[in-house]
A protein has these predicted regions:
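Predominantly extracellular/luminal regions of secreted and cell-surface proteins
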Residues: 1-28, 99
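Short charge-dense sequence patches
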Residues: 1-7, 38-48, 85-88, 123-131
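Short low-complexity stretches enriched in small and charged residues
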Residues: 8-9, 20, 53, 61, ...
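Acidic, metal-coordinating catalytic segment for phosphate/diphosphate chemistry
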Residues: 15-52
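N-terminal strand-loop-strand
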Residues: 40-76
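Unchanged
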Residues: 82-170
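Charged phosphate-binding loop/patch that engages nucleotide di/tri-phosphates or the phosphate backbone
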Residues: 166-182
Length: 182
């Protein structure tokens, strides 16, 4: 499995990330990718890579969030790499599948944000880490939304209201970056 492109993306992001905690997470993810040749597969026991889409409207006032069915949290769309080393393509694929939005524009080929978060055990799946690379994507809020089986709901949320739905540091960091303060 080819991990060079993933490592290049991570190292480039690590060098420009302003937040010390995010820099530290990027370094942890680099070490994880270097240590696990199967990091792009769900079968990688300690965790695996995921790609997420931080979908904003053109004026950068709203973000499209999904109310995740399994986790019960409002989050950005995203999902497992399932062997695909092109995490930009993973983020775009997951965004289309989870929102029904087809007209998505990758704002930058660079990583927008990274996060490392614990996924609790569920059924036969043990707890594990998601090492998430997030990409900034633009969409038109007028395009119809289609709620997938993975979601309870979808909503375009004013950036000022994101913290009321999900006060996690990583969500607030992406809000701050979107409004130009991070």
């Amino acid at each position: 499995m080819h991990r060079t492109a993933v490592l290049q993306l991570l190292r480039a992001h690590q060098s420009v990330a302003a937040d010390p905690h995010e820099q530290s997470m990027a370094a942890e993810i680099v070490r994880f990718v270097e240590a696990h040749s199967d990091c792009l597969l769900r079968t990688c026991a300690p965790g695996h890579l995921t790609g997420s889409a931080w979908i904003v409207d053109a004026p950068r006032c709203r973000v499209l969030l999904t109310h995740h069915r399994k986790l019960g949290w409002w989050l950005q769309p995203g999902g497992h790499a399932d062997g695909d080393p092109d995490l930009r393509a993973v983020a775009l694929r997951e965004a289309r599948e989870e929102t029904g939005v087809t007209q998505l524009r990758l704002v930058s080929s660079a990583v927008f944000d990274v996060d490392r978060h614990w996924i609790p055990p569920r059924g036969d799946t043990p707890g594990h880490w998601h090492h998430d690379l997030r990409f900034l994507i633009e969409a038109d809020p007028a395009e119809p939304l289609v709620i997938s089986d993975e979601s309870h709901d979808l909503a375009w949320v004013e950036l000022s209201r994101v913290s009321a739905l999900n006060p996690e540091d990583s969500m607030l960091r992406m809000v701050q970056k979107t409004i130009g303060r991070g």
